[in-house]
């Protein structure tokens, strides 16, 4: 017990000072590893530290444009120049830098009085500044020694979907600031989709006078409602768009931070908004009828070329994204113009007809000195000669692309779709579905093991995508982006052999604190709930390891086997994600009808199975479950019939259908029947106790 209040106060001051020392470079050993994200390629440590006190002399030896950008980057984090100071930061543009092969690489040498950063390109020096800034913000010093660093991949991107819900210019610039801090260099803007056209095209004013505005503010209300568009200025019009001046401002703002903005203009699908504003570009020539352009109509190519001409004037990026995904092609087989086009061009099917459009648009874009990116569906029907593939439906698209000698950007939904839940659904805002915690994002390696070194070199990079169907606000958008985009950043930058999740998590926790201090609505990683508790340990029960027989007409779906015939009695429960290879999926009319052989008669007190509902991808709870038991597998007596009124909602929910009582049986029959809505049923384990 302290002698008096003065003693207590002195102890508090000593403790606070010791804590501050630990937070301010007092121990050099882990400062860089815990605060620089992405983790650097190589660190050589020396004794001592450079502290940011008493003013800093700043010297920059680079072209004027780079010098202005670099000085601004230092100023933005609070490092200001004092030409009379005894300490200095020197940024040098060099012809070559030891240990660096990438133009985005850098080398920082630190003594107690001087920091010298070298790079062969303005971008490299900019990333050196980001490393300096992270340490300055975190601990107000830099340990002495040398950091040699460069990116693993050339393309390190974030995609913002600004169609499903529109996010304004200042918000986009704010995200540019954040991703630049973590050495990301591409911002992909998904500018067009059914939910709204978001960029001014002067030759086609109806795209922003009409196609940019819809009848409901929330995408889900509009999509499951009337799906009507509105005139700009109408009382019930919701939406927005970027003027061409807005785009120029965003592009320049990004360029000043060494980020390239890549525009996406969807074709031939996801174009309801265009075809309602300009219905003559569809196969039916009627508004509100089509999502796909009429590929046989020559006017479509005139429209697309005119749009892309204005887009390329606004966006100087080498790459233009032209979509190419999820075309229904429903009207093409019967459309006279499409049929005529197929005959004239000798096209065998509608997949080749889509490839005709993609290849033709590629030739146009190439003629302007640019190249195209498309979602992996552009592989169907033949890949355009110079296209880069963005692989989202798993990794197969990327593998096929590099096998054919094309570049691939890896963004598989399983690891890179940041619109999925990042924590337990009950603790998070409603999301599109799935469960993608930061640890799983971080586990992804964009280079498949099956690739040769030459093929691996064609993996251009990685991208995190934030689809906004269920993200109506800027605050929620940030919550979904951060901190998971930090995992994407480190995957894209750091050597594979340097990556370690526990060490990354420490960096990410520190980064989240900084992001929140800077006004970003980042998810608080320190309060992560984690995966579904039953999934964390095996469940030992009477049916574990026992044989399961599936009735004719009740097979599990090939994509969701969860390991096959043993899945429902393997003792392993699923997590929050139906795609985690633990949930078995059923879609046939027979529903679920299985029989478990316990091998001998057992005294049984309970039988239960959990089911998942996630309506957006079409996963529903059973409308009815029947549980029965038998001693001989021929005569079954019903233990329970459980009905349920299936109601569509937005949230992920789990429900247990079970029986409790007392019986003896060797065989357990478990049947689950779908409701009128159809869709999938998913269950993970039939637990018998």
Model segments located where?
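Flexible, acidic glycine-rich loops studded with aromatic residues
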Residues: 371-377, 382-387, 393-538
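Aromatic, loop-rich ligand-recognition surfaces of beta-strand-rich domains
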Residues: 576-640, 651-689
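Active-site neighborhood of glycoside hydrolase catalytic domains
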Residues: 274, 284, 289-385, 392-395, ...
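Predominantly extracellular/luminal regions of secreted and cell-surface proteins
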Residues: 537-573
């Amino acid at each position: 017990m302290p002698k008096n209040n003065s003693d207590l106060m002195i102890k508090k001051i000593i403790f606070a000072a010791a804590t501050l020392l630990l937070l301010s470079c007092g121990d050099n050993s882990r400062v860089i590893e815990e605060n620089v994200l992405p983790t650097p390629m190589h660190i050589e440590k020396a004794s001592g530290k450079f502290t940011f006190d008493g003013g800093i002399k700043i010297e920059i030896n680079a072209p004027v444009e780079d010098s202005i950008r670099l000085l601004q980057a230092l100023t933005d984090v609070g490092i200001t120049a004092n030409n009379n100071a005894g300490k200095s930061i020197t940024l040098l543009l060099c012809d070559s830098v030891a240990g660096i092969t990438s133009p985005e690489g850098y080398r920082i040498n630190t003594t107690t009085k001087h920091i010298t950063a070298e790079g062969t390109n303005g971008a490299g020096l900019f990333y050196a500044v980001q490393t300096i800034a992270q340490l300055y913000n975190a601990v107000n010093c830099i340990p002495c020694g040398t950091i040699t660093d460069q990116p693993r991949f050339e393309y390190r991107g974030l995609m913002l979907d600004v169609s499903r819900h529109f996010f304004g210019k200042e918000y986009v610039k704010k995200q540019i600031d954040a991703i630049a801090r973590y050495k990301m260099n591409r911002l992909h803007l998904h500018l067009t989709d059914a939910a709204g056209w978001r960029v001014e095209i002067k030759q086609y004013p109806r795209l922003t006078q009409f196609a940019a505005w819809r009848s409901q503010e929330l995408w889900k209300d509009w999509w499951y409602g009337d799906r009507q568009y509105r005139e700009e200025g109408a009382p019930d019009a919701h939406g927005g768009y970027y003027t061409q001046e807005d785009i120029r401002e965003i592009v320049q703002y990004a360029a000043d931070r060494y980020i390239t903005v890549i525009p996406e203009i969807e074709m031939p699908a996801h174009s309801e908004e265009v075809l309602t504003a300009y219905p003559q570009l569809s196969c039916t020539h009627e508004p509100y009828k089509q999502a796909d352009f009429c590929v046989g109509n020559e006017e479509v190519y005139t429209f697309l070329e005119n749009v892309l001409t204005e887009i390329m004037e606004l966006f100087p990026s080498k790459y233009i994204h032209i979509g190419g995904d999820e075309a229904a092609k429903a009207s093409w087989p019967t459309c006279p113009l499409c049929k005529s086009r197929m005959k004239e061009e000798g096209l065998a099917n509608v997949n080749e007809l889509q490839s005709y459009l993609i290849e033709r648009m590629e030739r146009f874009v190439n003629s302007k000195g640019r190249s195209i990116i498309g979602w992996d569906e552009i592989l169907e029907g033949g890949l355009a000669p110079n296209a880069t593939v963005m692989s989202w439906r798993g990794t197969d698209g990327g593998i096929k692309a590099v096998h054919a000698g094309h570049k691939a950007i890896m963004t598989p939904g399983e690891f890179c779709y940041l619109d999925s839940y990042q924590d337990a659904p009950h603790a998070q805002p409603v999301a599109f579905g799935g469960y993608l915690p930061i640890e799983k994002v971080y586990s992804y390696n964009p280079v498949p093991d099956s690739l040769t070194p030459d093929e691996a070199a064609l993996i251009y990079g990685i991208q995190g995508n934030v689809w906004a169907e269920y993200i109506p606000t800027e605050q929620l958008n940030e919550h979904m982006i951060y901190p998971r985009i930090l995992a994407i950043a480190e995957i894209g930058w750091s050597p594979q052999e340097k990556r370690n999740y526990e060490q990354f998590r420490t960096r990410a926790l520190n980064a989240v604190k900084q992001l929140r201090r800077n006004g970003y609505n980042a998810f608080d990683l320190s309060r992560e709930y984690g995966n579904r508790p039953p999934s964390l340990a095996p469940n030992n029960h009477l049916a574990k390891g026992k044989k399961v027989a599936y009735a004719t007409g009740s097979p599990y779906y090939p994509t969701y086997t969860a390991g096959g015939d043993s899945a429902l009695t393997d003792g392993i429960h699923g997590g929050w994600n139906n795609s985690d290879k633990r949930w078995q999926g059923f879609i046939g009319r027979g529903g679920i009808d299985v029989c478990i052989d316990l091998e001998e008669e057992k005294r049984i007190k309970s039988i239960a199975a959990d089911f998942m509902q996630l309506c957006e991808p079409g996963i529903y709870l059973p409308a009815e479950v029947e549980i029965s038991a038998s001693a001989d597998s021929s005569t079954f007596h019903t233990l329970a019939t459980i009905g349920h009124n299936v109601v569509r909602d937005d949230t992920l929910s789990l429900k247990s259908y079970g029986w409790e009582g007392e019986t003896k049986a060797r065989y357990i029959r478990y049947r689950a029947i779908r409701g009128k809505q159809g869709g999938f049923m998913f269950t993970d384990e039939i637990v018998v106790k």
